[in-house]
């Protein structure tokens, strides 16, 4: 890279550094957003494995709506249900380099309403 990191990559590094400092060995709720879909997963970094995951690619969500805020909220709700079934209540929210706005915020709010604490 001739010029260094892009703004997105610098923001992602800054968020991850903060998570490592404040994480206290909690599982990490990682969010990835594309133009068509949103993906979320709860990752246990100590064991290096994904505990639960949800996305708008799932048939039940995909049939209802596409890349909308409502679809992101439904994904957050499903993720919270699966996490509570796996015994996870407290997580650290990893938004990656994405701004906390729109679909990312809708997913986070729905996950909080579903019982996840962050």
UniProtKB/Swiss-Prot annotation:
Protein name per its UniProtKB record: Large ribosomal subunit protein uL18
Pfam families: Ribosomal_L18p
Record-level GO BP terms: translation
Record flagged with keyword RNA-binding: yes
CC terms in the record's Gene Ontology section: cytoplasm; ribonucleoprotein complex; ribosome
InterPro entries attached to this UniProt entry: Ribosomal_uL18_bac-type, Ribosomal_uL18_bac/euk
Known function: This is one of the proteins that bind and probably mediate the attachment of the 5S RNA into the large ribosomal subunit, where it forms part of the central protuberance.
Gene3D superfamilies the UniProt entry points to: 3.30.420.100
This protein's encoding gene: rplR
GO MF, any single term: 5S rRNA binding
Subunit structure: Part of the 50S ribosomal subunit; part of the 5S rRNA/L5/L18/L25 subcomplex. Contacts the 5S and 23S rRNAs.
Keywords: Ribonucleoprotein, Ribosomal protein, RNA-binding, rRNA-binding
Family (UniProt): Belongs to the universal ribosomal protein uL18 family.
């Amino acid at each position: 890279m001739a010029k260094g990191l892009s703004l997105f990559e610098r923001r992602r590094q800054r968020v991850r550094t903060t998570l490592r400092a404040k994480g206290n060995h909690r599982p990490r709720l990682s969010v990835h957003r594309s133009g068509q879909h949103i993906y979320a997963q709860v990752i246990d970094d100590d064991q290096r494995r994904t505990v639960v995951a949800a996305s708008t690619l799932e048939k039940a969500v995909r049939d209802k709506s596409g890349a909308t805020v409502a679809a992101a909220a439904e994904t957050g709700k499903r993720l919270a249900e699966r996490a509570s079934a796996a015994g996870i209540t407290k997580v650290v929210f990893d938004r990656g380099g994405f701004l906390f706005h729109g679909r990312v915020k809708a997913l986070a709010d729905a996950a909080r309403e579903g019982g996840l604490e962050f």
